[in-house]
A protein has these predicted regions:
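Active-site-proximal, substrate-binding regions of enzyme catalytic domains
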Residues: 1-94, 101, 110-112, 151-154, ...
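Acidic, PIN/NYN-like endoribonuclease modules and their adjacent C-terminal/linker elements
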Residues: 42-44, 104-166
Length: 166
């Protein structure tokens, strides 16, 4: 079972690779707060998903709203991140897709296995759904607010076996 925060989805939409979520994971669960964030920034995408006979995004409601509130306050996370982390705990998820540094740190502290957008792209390449990761990272940098440090950029190229001269 895979749960996602908003940023992985919005960034995959921005580079026109949202299909990767369904190709890699078949179904991805999002908490209500993530659905609401997506409905504000990508309403057309959500209406297209809802029109599908078997949508790959499934919305689930967090049971313990108090834990969400506590996590928001203690870790200084937004609603989507907080609900995604608590839902991951409640559903004992296999993997949480999350990019924000604080959210990732909190999820790991709570014992949740995580990956982010770059991990999704790498898995997409490994499994043959993506030809090359480098042009997708470049498109992310150009078309969104996604930031990749030069060190991480090089590390991802190395992992994707796209580093020139090596």
């Amino acid at each position: 079972m895979i749960i996602s925060d908003t940023s992985v989805i919005t960034n995959l939409i921005s580079i026109e690779h949202i299909f990767l979520l369904q190709a890699l994971y078949e179904k991805v669960i999002i908490p209500q707060a993530v659905y609401e964030e997506l409905s504000r920034c990508h309403p057309l995408f959500l209406s297209e998903i809802q029109a599908e006979k078997s949508p790959f995004l499934e919305v689930k409601t967090v049971k313990d709203k108090n834990k969400v509130y506590e996590l928001k306050q203690q870790a200084k996370l937004d609603n989507g991140e907080s609900e995604a982390i608590i839902l991951a705990l409640e559903l004992k998820t296999d993997l949480l897709l999350i990019d924000e540094r604080r959210g990732r740190a909190e999820a790991q502290r709570l014992g949740i296995r995580i990956t982010g957008l770059l991990g999704v792209l790498l898995e997409g390449k490994t499994r043959g759904f993506v030809v090359a990761v480098k042009p997708l990272m470049n498109k992310l940098i150009e078309n969104s607010t996604f930031w990749i440090s030069p060190l991480l950029y090089d590390k991802i190229l190395l992992l994707a076996q796209e580093k020139e001269g090596e």
